[in-house]
């Protein structure tokens, strides 16, 4: 499969939509406790990929906003199932800030600064100069997931063109406290 995805045009020839049903992976979001050694205490919720044999791999991105972005889509897919769709960062500003606070335990004003950097690039005077780092965070997500499971197996685990995770909703397990989020 890895060879196929490297061939020019192969992604147009093969129907990758069925990969979500065939994926052996699960996404799990757990509340941090001191038994979880892969994450430090900064993380109140931890994302793991679990393979078909039950081995868990911690999912850590280079940027914390990418971690929250990915978690938004995990929660959305787990709670809305097949109705999950693209999530507007601007429409979900308050939900994103609340999620950031929940995941990292920081005050509202700090989480809001993270959101502003995410959605906009600001000058020293606080004025919007251009769009934010959304594309950088998507690339961070793609690279991290691919490094854990490989290119072909990463397809249903990435945020694709449709704007949602293609992994089947029953393969996503989240802590019940995260079901309070209502993304749109």
Report the location of each language-model feature.
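Residue-identity detector for threonine
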Residues: 5, 11, 35, 79, ...
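Short, Lys/Arg-enriched segments at the junction into DNA-binding effector domains
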Residues: 6-84
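DNA-binding patch around the recognition helix
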Residues: 14-42, 80, 133-184
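Short amphipathic alpha-helical recognition elements used for nucleic-acid or partner binding
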Residues: 56-119, 141
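DNA-recognition element of transcription regulators
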Residues: 62-70, 125-148
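Short, Lys/Arg-enriched charge-dense amphipathic segments
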Residues: 107-120, 127, 172-184
């Amino acid at each position: 499969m890895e060879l196929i995805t490297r061939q020019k045009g192969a992604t147009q020839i093969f129907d990758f939509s069925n990969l979500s049903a065939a994926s052996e992976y699960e996404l799990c979001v757990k509340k941090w406790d001191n038994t979880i050694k892969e994450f430090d205490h900064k993380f109140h919720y931890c994302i793991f990929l679990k393979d078909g044999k039950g081995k868990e791999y911690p999912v850590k991105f280079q940027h914390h906003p990418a971690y929250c972005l990915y978690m938004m889509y995990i929660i959305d897919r787990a709670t809305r199932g097949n109705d999950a769709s693209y999530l507007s960062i601007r429409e979900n500003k308050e939900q994103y800030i609340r999620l950031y606070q929940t995941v990292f335990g920081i005050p509202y004003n700090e989480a809001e600064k993270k959101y502003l950097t995410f959605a906009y690039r600001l000058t020293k005077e606080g004025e919007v100069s251009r769009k934010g780092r959304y594309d950088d965070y998507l690339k961070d997500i793609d690279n991290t997931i691919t490094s854990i499971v490989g290119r072909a197996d990463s397809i249903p685990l990435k945020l694709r063109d449709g704007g949602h995770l293609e992994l089947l909703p029953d393969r996503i397990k989240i802590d019940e406290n995260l079901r309070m989020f209502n993304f749109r």
